[in-house]
């Protein structure tokens, strides 16, 4: 009997050892990219893989929201937990849609939080006073108080993030790529210079270029109206940008009709500077001319009023863009004027770049500006703008914006959020990625249509 028990124990021990060895072997087969709960070999099933990615993001958001809620309960606001994308959400480039380098999006890197910057930046934007004291007294004053109270009518899926967080930059590039956007126009101030509510951001450019290159995106520069901007310091700043960043593989160049590939610079509020000053920089006879030099480029002026057309010609600019996402707000942003603007540009050999946006609402920072709010209508407003832009057969289209949250023009993912004082807008009944999906749809349509009319208009096609 004892021998039988001993034999049984030996067999049982060998069986347990076999099961343990089998489990260890299966564990070794599990792919490195699998997240918790992901069965091994899931990458072989793309549809399941994508579904798991989506669920993983939902889990991360719920976790982040719970952390923020607990933080508020304890009144601890010194640290913001920035949501990290899971490894499973890193898609292969082969799984992403083709790029459209004729579709640009305006991108802002001015956000900050305590975790990466020691304080909140831009999320705590002040409420701006109306210039008429009689109107101003009817509205609240002060600053927003993140993370639950931010200077936006929508709430980001990533929370009140920092533009310095590498994982945030990575997520942004992935979202742009998923939307078939080829070029981001980076809001830019010279080194050690910043907007009145921010901090210097030029030191972020190398990381943004590197992350963009990972997704085969290109970066162009949207030069902001820094203090005392003129022909001389513009020359120095253009030289700085090209010398420092021009050799990076993600640095954007546009191939002109003559076959030259030149850097492109959007110049915000260009009308502030007199045409004579611009002509010093942008005409061949100018005293600070960049023309036919290593620092030559394509300079795109912001057209607000109709009269700016002739100032732009006199200045020597290479094209115009309209920026504002509010149809009817300015002459340039009004869809009905785009056809005539395109004819004007064709006549004078200028590049016409209409700017489209998903909507507009800035009442979180300008509560008195309700007349310029444009409802998104579940994506219809955006599609109307894109359709109007395509009808003009433009050389390029710009999107306002990827993440200008203060003015509610973002196509970045937003989520529902409610606090005791605020109910944020969101994209429901659609998913947080609605505007990325719509952008992808129209990018593909634009790419096909542009290929058909490019030869007739002698536009570059590569």
UniProtKB/Swiss-Prot annotation:
**Protein family:** Belongs to the glycosyl hydrolase 99 family.
The species is: Pongo abelii
**Top-level EC class:** hydrolase
What top-level branch of life does the organism fall under? Eukaryota
- What catalytic activity does the UniProt entry give for this protein? N-{alpha-Glc-(1->3)-alpha-Man-(1->2)-alpha-Man-(1->2)-alpha-Man-(1->3)-[alpha-Man-(1->2)-alpha-Man-(1->3)-[alpha-Man-(1->2)-alpha-Man-(1->6)]-alpha-Man-(1->6)]-beta-Man-(1->4)-beta-GlcNAc-(1->4)-beta-GlcNAc}-L-asparaginyl-[protein] + H2O = alpha-D-glucosyl-(1->3)-D-mannopyranose + N(4)-{alpha-D-Man-(1->2)-alpha-D-Man-(1->3)-[alpha-D-Man-(1->2)-alpha-D-Man-(1->3)-[alpha-D-Man-(1->2)-alpha-D-Man-(1->6)]-alpha-D-Man-(1->6)]-beta-D-Man-(1->4)-beta-D-GlaNAc-(1->4)-beta-D-GlcNAc}-L-asparaginyl-[protein] (N-glucan mannose isomer 8A1,2,3B1,2)
Q: Where are the transmembrane segments?
A: 9-29
Q: Where in the cell is it found?
A: Golgi apparatus membrane
Location of the region described as Catalytic in the Swiss-Prot/TrEMBL record = 60-462
E.C. designation(s): 3.2.1.130
Q: Please list the GO terms describing molecular function.
A: glycoprotein endo-alpha-1,2-mannosidase activity
Q: What are its GO cellular component terms?
A: Golgi membrane
Gene expressing this chain? MANEA
Question: Which loops or segments lie on the Cytoplasmic side of the membrane, by the record?
Answer: 1-8
User: So which stretches are on the Lumenal side?
Assistant: 30-462
Query: Topology versus the membrane, per the UniProt entry?
Result: Single-pass type II membrane protein
Keyword field: Golgi apparatus, Hydrolase, Membrane, Signal-anchor, Transmembrane, Transmembrane helix
Q: Keyword rRNA-binding on this protein?
A: no
User: Can you say what this protein is called?
Assistant: Glycoprotein endo-alpha-1,2-mannosidase
Record's comment on post-translational modification: Undergoes proteolytic cleavage in the C-terminal region.
